[in-house]
Amino acid sequence: MKILIELPTWLGDTVMTTPAIENLVKIIGNAEITLFGPMISVETLKNHPSVISTHIVDKNLINLYKTLKCLGHFDIFLSFRGSLRVKLIRLFISAERKYQFNTKKYINQHQVEKYNNFVNESLDIESSPGALLIHSNNLPKKHSTTLLGINPGESYGS
């Protein structure tokens, strides 16, 4: 089954979609996922075993339209974004079923639960969100030394 997923703009939100995407793959065993979104989001999830193609979003609507038209047909389109722009994008995507995250529908929940419930309701499934998971094929199997990562943070909206 061919699935097109539009990822959120923010890296943190993208990581919080991973339990929903993992549940989607478990339910739909033969999922072939195409990702599109901002470069940071696509780069984060591109190594998922079910991802067959990735596309970076061009903010220019004409270029975006051309890219979307070249993607072909999908069985399912899921957008984890709730913007008006996505409503326009949905018109250009060829998919049997199209779903867009509604920011006003899911309240008083953690973002992981919101994204998971969105996928559950869209596909009429029931699955609990699991752990956040980023697939990587670039990390060595064993570390001989301690590895420390530091995130200096980011200003909201930049």
Where are these regions (language model features)?
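Catalytic machinery of carbohydrate-active enzymes
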Residues: 1-158
